[in-house]
Amino acid sequence: MHVMGSQQENNNPGRVSEQESSCIREDNLSTLETELLHPFSQKIDQFSAREIVELMNQVDADVIQAVGDQVDEIAAAIEVIKDRFHQGGRLIYVGAGTSGRLGVLDAAECPPTFSTAPEMVRAVIAGGSQALVQAVEGVEDRPEQGAFDLGQLAISQTDVVVGIASSGRTPYCIGAIKKARDCGAYTIGLVCNRST
């Protein structure tokens, strides 16, 4: 897991940066760790139920280390979000597929768990509410749709937009993050590949 925050001036509104452009290229997919089979699970179909549970538990332990490696970045992100909340801003998650569903889940859980107003933590998912229960294929590959969907929330400089993309290169999220930057919002990327 990697957390990156940014409050950058956009010198070229409407233009995708070289770094963002390299993230969109399809040829990157075959080399990304998140897109490969995990070496421990290549024969999972031959494991007993107990072996599967033990394997999942062993691999889940990696999550603790991944979060531990990002403590400073996570704490810095929390401080920015707290400051933006104090300014009347919102936390807005953006994602596609499972990443989007996790953003929606967290946004839905904040009001009952932390007594936040429903509009304080929001989520945008590629494919809209239908994508919560059924895959909506192809939308994740459209950066302009991510920008449009996020734009429906009237993003401001007090908002924080978190793009969640396991691969770190989902075009829908990149388009939404670019739109957020154009609006002056603070942006955070939550990704699982070191190179993205």
Positions of predicted regions on the chain:
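Intrinsic-disorder-associated, low-complexity terminal segments enriched in Asp/Asn/His/Tyr and depleted
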Residues: 10-12
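Short, surface-exposed alpha-helical recognition segments that flank or form part
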Residues: 65-72, 134-138
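Short secondary-structure boundary/capping elements
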Residues: 44-48, 73, 138-145
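A short, well-structured juxtamembrane/interface segment
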Residues: 69-84
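Anion (oxyanion) recognition and catalysis
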Residues: 85-86, 181
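Glycine-rich phosphate-binding loops that contact phosphosugars or nucleotide phosphates
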Residues: 92-196
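Glycine-centered, small-residue-biased loops immediately flanking beta-strands
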Residues: 89
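Cofactor-/ligand-binding subdomain signature composed of acidic, glycine-rich
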Residues: 5, 14, 18-66, 70
